[in-house]
Amino acid sequence: MIYEHGGDLDKAINKYGGKKEQWIDLSTGINPNSYPHSDINITEFRNLPSKSDILKLNEIAKRSFQTNASVSSLMGAQAAINILPVLFPIGNITILEPTYNEYNKVFSDFSRNIITVRTLHELKNSQIAILCNPNNPDGRLYSNEDLIELSKNVQVLIIDESFIDQYPEYSLSTKINNQTNNIIILRSFGKFF
């Protein structure tokens, strides 16, 4: 099951009333007053991206995020979160909380054993450890050193860096190498672009 992730104004209007133009939808991160891109060819929106388009996009992402790690482009961090239970069909899931609740929801849908913890130290010895850096909603930050050390003590470390652009020195994406091949980092292109 894929959970709703904002943007359903009809549902909100049915529950709370009002008209669409009276609502400000902050749930999607889409600017209702976007920049007028008059130089974009509309035909670009009529075709699915080609393999070469995707490879080019991944190279741009690698440069933008200053990483040599493998990159996969998806339709947002939420799309990545939704496929995690399929990528990791076995193993206990340990989530550092409080945090973005979609991790718990998607793994619960797959009847996974979920353990919630409150400190970075409690993630040690996890099969699959999940945290946000900075954390959503409280903004906690974790150092690169602490995260690399943690990665040595878990089977898989998933780090959601969707809001890291404000703190580039805390991003682990520039530190990924063949010694850290058990780390998966989720980055978001649209949060601050």
Regions from the language model: what does each represent?
Residues V86-N144:
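PLP-dependent aminotransferase-like
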Residues G29-Y35, A77, N133-P137, I164, ...:
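Short glycine-rich anion-binding loops that position phosphate/pyrophosphate groups of nucleotides
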